[in-house]
Amino acid sequence: MLHLLALFLHCLPLASGDYDICKSWVTTDEGPTWEFYACQPKVMRLKDYVKVKVEPSGITCGDPPERFCSHENPYLCSNECDASNPDLAHPPRLMFDKEEEGLATYWQSITWSRYPSPLEANITLSWNKTVELTDDVVMTFEYGRPTVMVLEKSLDNGRTWQPYQFYAEDCMEAFGMSARRARDMSSSSAHRVLCTEEYSRWAGSKKEKHVRFEVRDRFAIFAGPDLRNMDNLYTRLESAKGLKEFFTLTDLRMRLLRPALGGTYVQRENLYKYFYAISNIEVIGRCKCNLHANLCSMREGSLQCECEHNTTGPDCGKCKKNFRTRSWRAGSYLPLPHGSPNACATAGSFGNCECYGHSNRCSYIDFLNVVTCVSCKHNTRGQHCQHCRLGYYRNGSAELDDENVCIECNCNQIGSVHDRCNETGFCECREGAAGPKCDDCLPTHYWRQGCYPNVCDDDQLLCQNGGTCLQNQRCACPRGYTGVRCEQPRCDPADDDGGLDCDRAPGAAPRPATLLGCLLLLGLAARLGR
């Protein structure tokens, strides 16, 4: 009977844009089967599942007992905070309790009695689960809102933090930022972090209590002021980079940096009126299940998705065993109105194993949670055989499933650094080499089983003394000259006695040794003539 009831509920008509049904029993030509849809859990009050932590230790009032007063009656300090007295204590849990009408219960910090040392507090809300905000975060302060505050979020259970929104009565002075309002942002800036002055200026502690992180104003940029065009919002959540992730978190942290001052400067004569007091923190959202579940419940002390589509894990972030023929993928809101489930599939559900026809075998890598192709053919490689092997490049005129999708680089072994090339087929050349395959030389080099710098040319490396440059490799020097570029006179043996005859070009000055020999001969001839 219960099985029939469950089947009946799954067969109810699908509500457009709600994404509240994960599967439906349908009849096909091959018989009845389940049809899957993208789905998500219902919105809930996340504060009912939160764990709160207040830092630093000793920031909560009452230990030891302490007097305090309000800004309205700053000199009537008859109020007392005493942690040992339940009627006078203000522990952190009172930020999330159910209050009777007309009676506010609240957490309260110590007063600023140690001024000028800063009065700062961190309030961390943790869910140990990835959640998505669907409405404004509303923080209610008794006795005045902080004049400086930062709201931060974490995506990794509090290991790292990033700013979510800045709050100050003067944004430029506090954070060096211009003040902005969420309602004035554009579609391209809806996920940017801003500083607002809207919730920090003094308006009387009993008049303005709320501090907001505006989710609805950001949604309204896409869905309209009444949030009626949800189809457009879902479309933008899928298509706008970073938008969906902006509303996703595991933890929130309020960094209270300066308390309410009552619209004036700090008055040193009465520091008991400066403190923080929070009566409520409202967080509306849903479990993030990657559009693979419509139910989320407390199990083993934390929220967990009740996964469909053959997925598993706290966020339905993995495929079940025996359903790993293809890599896990999150569901999608598109196409409207039911989205794409991207369900994990059993073995044999996909004949080509998503390898573009270059392999018919796949393997599941557990620690990476991916399915990868094995033994890619046609010189391909990669998770889906979508890349070319080293030494090959993509054929731009061929489709990914073409056997000739990868072309060999054919780099010249001597002129190239290695046998690999870039995506256009150009090889990495050694010094002096050029050309797509490195089989040519730069104009300043010549080829001889590799590229070598020119010895001579007709431009800058000229052969001297009438020499002729032969193929940029050497200078052919005229009689009487030698050297790389014919820059040195040549000396040859002159007789059998080992003397040297240094030829010189016409008009060249005689060498000193030759001149000395001539003088000696002239002297000898003069003596003989006597």
From Swiss-Prot:
GO biological process, one term: postsynaptic specialization assembly
Domain Laminin EGF-like, residue spans: 287-346, 353-408, 409-453
Keywords (A to Z) from UniProt: Autism spectrum disorder, Cell membrane, Developmental protein, Differentiation, Disease variant, Disulfide bond, Glycoprotein, GPI-anchor, Intellectual disability, Laminin EGF-like domain, Lipoprotein, Membrane, Neurogenesis, Repeat, Signal
Outcome reported for the amino acid change (mutating M149T): In NEDBASH; abolished cell surface expression
Residues cleaved off as propeptide: 508-530
CDD domains membership: EGF_CA, EGF_Lam
Subcellular location: Cell membrane
UniProt PTM comment: N-glycosylated.
Gene3D superfamilies: Galactose-binding domain-like (2.60.120.260), Laminin (2.10.25.10)
Region (NGL discriminant loop III): 264-267
Cysteine pairings via disulfide bonds: C22-C39, C61-C81, C69-C77, C171-C195, C287-C296, C289-C305, C307-C316, C319-C344, C353-C362, C355-C373, C376-C385, C388-C406, C409-C421, C411-C427, C429-C438, C441-C451, C456-C469, C463-C475, C477-C486
Name of the protein in its database record: Netrin-G2
Ranges where the Laminin N-terminal domain occurs: 35-286
SUPFAM superfamilies recorded: EGF/Laminin
One cellular component term from this protein's GO annotations in UniProt: side of membrane
Residues glycosylated per entry: N122, N128, N310, N395, N422
